[in-house]
A protein has these predicted regions:
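C-terminal cap/substrate-recognition subdomain and adjoining C-terminal extension
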Residues: 1-2, 82-210
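Active-site neighborhood of HAD-like aspartate-dependent phosphohydrolases
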Residues: 1-53
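A residue-identity detector for tryptophan
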Residues: 5, 33, 62-63, 74, ...
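Generic alpha-helical secondary-structure signal
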Residues: 26, 77, 179-180
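Short amphipathic alpha-helical patches
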Residues: 34, 38, 46-51, 66-70, ...
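Metal-dependent phosphoesterase signature
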Residues: 56-91
């Protein structure tokens, strides 16, 4: 059994930007009529601000924006959006090229979205495992069946690993970062770094660029 696993967030950690929010905006711009459901989208945004209700909030947003979208249309939009993404940070690309076979990428973004971006950037060199939010259809729209965010990233299979390195840009991922013997905070603001160090004094900062 390996004892040198790496756990990595995706958005703003391996690649710049929030591809989850970006995909939602991309779908909305190409469908437009879900703007009629803007009150539902806004309500979802407000509910999302309540930490214990994040999954319900993001589900409302997803449902309103994807209502009536076919599975084929969903796959086409994901593929098209992946082609617009800027790529991986140079340091992230080097990490995955060298150590991808021991890397678990764990993201709040839909798994199909993360895998699509990784496949485009590293064809034939995907990480050991890619975990993300699992989507399903309900009442005519898409929503997360499982929202892989924050503490929920620490799945039983993750707890069973011996992790040498964990990396993320987000304070929501402190539980993930705490799994690693070594932890990297990617491109933090001074305030974010201060908050992270209060919980994980050993955390290191990394400045990554495209």
């Amino acid at each position: 059994m390996r004892t040198d696993w790496i756990l990595a967030d995706f958005d703003d950690t391996l690649a710049p930007g929030d591809s989850h929010a970006g995909l939602l905006r991309y779908i909305l711009r190409r469908r437009l009529w879900p703007l009629l459901l803007l009150p539902v989208i806004a309500l979802g945004g407000l509910v999302y601000l309540v930490p214990s209700r994040r999954r319900q909030g993001i589900s409302l947003i997803w449902w309103a924006i994807t209502l009536g979208l076919s599975p084929l249309g969903w796959r086409k939009l994901v593929r098209a959006y992946c082609r617009t993404r800027p790529g991986l940070f140079c340091e992230a690309r080097a990490l995955l090229m060298k150590d991808g076979d021991r890397c678990w990428v764990i993201s709040a973004s839909p798994r199909v979205l993360v895998r699509g971006q990784l496949h485009q950037q590293l064809p034939g060199k995907l990480p050991h495992r890619t975990l993300g939010s699992r989507m399903h259809y309900r009442l005519g729209g898409l929503m997360p069946r499982f929202y892989c965010h924050g503490q929920h990233k620490i799945l039983p299979e993750i707890r069973a690993l011996t992790v040498t390195l964990a990396l993320s840009d987000s304070l929501h991922d402190l539980p993930l970062l705490a799994q690693g013997a070594e932890a990297w905070l990617i491109n933090p603001t001074p305030l974010r770094l201060q908050k992270a160090q209060a919980c994980l004094p050993h955390i290191m900062t990394k400045r990554w660029r495209l």
